[in-house]
Amino acid sequence: MLALCLLLGSLVGCGGQPAANSAKAAVQSLLDRQSAAVLHHDGTAYARTGARTAYENLSAVPLASWSYRLTSLHRAGAIATADAQLSYRVKGYDTAPVTVGRALTLRLTADGQWYVASDKPAKKSGQQLWDQGKVSVVKGAHSLVMGVGRSVDSLRDFRALADHAVPAVSAAWGTDWTRHVVVLVPGSLDGMAGLLGSPAASYRGIAAVTTGEAGGSGSAPADRIIVNPDAYAVLGSVGKQVVLTHETTHVATRAHTTPATPLWLSEGYADWIGYRGTGRTPTQAAPELSRAVQDGDLPTALPTDKDFGFSSEATELARAYEGGWMACRMIQDRWGVDQLGKFYRAVGSHQKRAGAVEGAMKNVLGVTLEEFTEQWRDYLRAQLA
């Protein structure tokens, strides 16, 4: 009986393992053919592997690479579910593959071939832009803008903002970064939340965020600026530019922004570059903090990371951003633009938060944290009272 089982196993999968391996190999081959169709812009070949709508949604995206790695397969007759890792690079922008988890449903066709019936984000992964519909693409001198449910004219407006932001950031920070940005413009707040894999309520009123690869681990081979079109639409022309320049600053400073960097510095520095050259006065750019100072409620300490939580009360959140901006503005006023950049880099060079700010203040600015805080409070009185 054992000999018979061994013989039949080599032919029909006695015990199930050879058959399972065969199915995995067949599905991986299917995904390889589908990936080749994407890269070769071959809609006909893609349609033999999966729904053509999925191909049409992403066909305008300029891709340098696109591949799947099957990690698990669970078959139940003519239907199977699978987990896979999708890796891709946007041509000219991503220096390494973006990798995200995908959950696939497959079915056997009448001729016994596997077919991708659905391809969705894995349980803990955010959506990709093409999961939300057909992607339109506009390329700029320093930017790539991709949107869903947006007119080409509106994407061109974002391109103009991004193309202005990149050289503005380089003028203040320097040129030791990629000097280009990818901007994603979904159709709504819900679309933004889908890309981030978070509840929409977390980003209501937030005009844009910068993240590592959308839906990925956050250890970013490339950053994405993701716009909340609902909040962005209510901004004036200066506000729209400030937001895009702020987010572009996060892209530029990514390599020097570490766990040692407090949010008052990373957000304050991004706002400082964002407002630079706009002509906005402190009372105009920091209205909530200005009201607090004028009411005698002068902050006793620099904003904490907790103060920047999206769940914070709107006024408190605004004061945190404004307080960080005023701290960076003070450094520029008293020590200069170059020293502000050196201070930012010095803080980020530390391995951990403890002592990072204090060490950088002593080495770059020549003051203690206590002295800096008192100078900042005096600066708030002078500028906002």
Which sequence ranges carry the predicted segments?
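Bacterial N-terminal signal peptides
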Residues: L2-L11
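Bacterial signal peptide processing site
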Residues: V12-Q17
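Short solvent-exposed beta->alpha transition segments
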Residues: P18-Q28, D32-I79
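Surface-exposed, charged secondary-structure patches
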Residues: N57-A103, A231-A233
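Extracytoplasmic
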Residues: G77-T81, G101, D111, Q132, ...
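Short beta-strand edge/turn micro-motifs at domain boundaries
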Residues: D94-K134
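Juxtacatalytic substrate-recognition/specificity segment
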Residues: K139-P262, R353-A356
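Acidic/His/Gly-enriched intrinsically disordered linker/tail segments
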Residues: T211-G218, V238-G239, T257-A385
